[in-house]
C-alpha cells in the first residue's frame, strides 16, 4: 500500500 499516494488523495479530497 502506497501511503504517500493515499495521503495525497486524502489531501486532494480535503481541498
From Swiss-Prot:
Keyword Oxidoreductase in annotation: no
TM stretches of this protein: none
Gene Ontology cellular-component terms listed: extracellular region; membrane; other organism cell membrane
Taxonomic superkingdom: Eukaryota
Subcellular location, principal: secreted
Tissues in which the protein is found: Expressed by the venom gland.
UniProt site positions, description: May enhance the stabilization of the helical conformation but leads to a lower membrane selectivity compared to its homologs that do not have a C-terminal Asn: 15
Localisation per UniProt entry: Secreted; Target cell membrane
GO biological process: defense response to bacterium; defense response to fungus; innate immune response; killing of cells of another organism
Modified positions (Asparagine amide) in chain numbering: 15
UniProt keywords, alphabetically: Amidation, Antibiotic, Antimicrobial, Fungicide, Immunity, Innate immunity, Membrane, Secreted, Target cell membrane, Target membrane
Role played: Antimicrobial peptide with high activity on Gram-positive (S.mutans, and S.aureus), and Gram-negative bacteria (S.enterica), as well as on fungi (C.albicans, C.glabrata, and C.neoformans). Shows a potent hemolysis on human erythrocytes. Together with phospholipase A1, stimulates prostaglandin E2 release from murine peritoneal cells and macrophages.
Family: Belongs to the MCD family. Mastoparan subfamily.
Name of protein: Mastoparan-V1
Amino acid at each position: 500500500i502506497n501511503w504517500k499516494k493515499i495521503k495525497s488523495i486524502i489531501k486532494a479530497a480535503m481541498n
